[in-house]
């Protein structure tokens, strides 16, 4: 690999609103998300707890965009892996800039936990080995597949890896 640098963003946060999905002329899906990440700390002078929230614009493409539009809702917790991009445009003679996290087919969008307003029937499977179970986690070995390999048309509110589904991985290690 002859990369001159690394451009990788990892976020774990909650959606500020429902995803906005649109389709571009070639038929591909594009979803826009607003993801909030927060950090909290104790103020050394006052002893009060403080919190700072950052809002991130996330753009998903392809099947990931379709899955986000179908299953993600405001308040849902998500894990995002993508690339940071800044684009510019002209707005009546004023150059405007926006920085976004792009999640292409090589990126990852993983649903974590459940949204606060969901009922008990839509709860995810419990965590195993500290890893949340989602459509990106395979049954064997906890190996992770890329988001583009997920199946978008699953009837459950939050898709889970079907029991017994074979992804072509073997438990036999050749060494």
UniProtKB/Swiss-Prot annotation:
The keyword DNA-binding applies. Residues 163-175 have a biased composition (Acidic residues). The keyword Membrane does not apply. Residues 115-136 have a biased composition (Low complexity). Keywords: DNA replication, DNA-binding, Plasmid. It comes from the Bacteria. Coiled coil: none annotated. One of its GO terms (molecular function) is single-stranded DNA binding. GO terms for biological process: DNA replication. One of its GO terms (cellular component) is nucleoid. Residues 6-110 form the SSB domain. Residues 55-61 bind DNA. Residues 114-175 are annotated as: Disordered. May contribute to the conjugative processing of DNA. It has a functional relationship with Psi (plasmid-mediated sos inhibition) proteins. Homotetramer. HAMAP family: SSB. This is Plasmid-derived single-stranded DNA-binding protein. It comes from Escherichia coli. The gene is ssb.
């Amino acid at each position: 690999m002859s990369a001159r640098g690394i451009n990788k963003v990892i976020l774990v946060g909650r959606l500020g609103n429902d995803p906005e999905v649109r389709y571009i002329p070639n038929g591909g899906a594009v979803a826009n998300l607003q993801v909030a990440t927060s950090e909290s700390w104790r103020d050394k002078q006052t002893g009060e707890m403080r919190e700072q929230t950052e809002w991130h614009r996330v753009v998903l493409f392809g099947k990931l965009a379709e899955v986000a539009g179908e299953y993600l809702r405001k308040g849902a917790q998500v894990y995002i892996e993508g690339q940071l991009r800044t684009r510019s445009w002209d707005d009546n003679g004023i150059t405007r800039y926006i920085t976004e996290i792009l999640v292409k087919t090589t990126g990852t969008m993983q649903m974590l936990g459940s949204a606060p307003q969901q009922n008990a029937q839509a709860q995810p499977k419990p965590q195993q080995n500290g890893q949340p179970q989602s459509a990106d986690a395979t049954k064997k070995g906890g190996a992770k597949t890329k988001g583009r390999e997920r199946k978008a048309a699953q009837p459950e509110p939050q898709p889970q890896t079907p029991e017994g589904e074979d992804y072509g991985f073997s438990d036999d290690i050749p060494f």
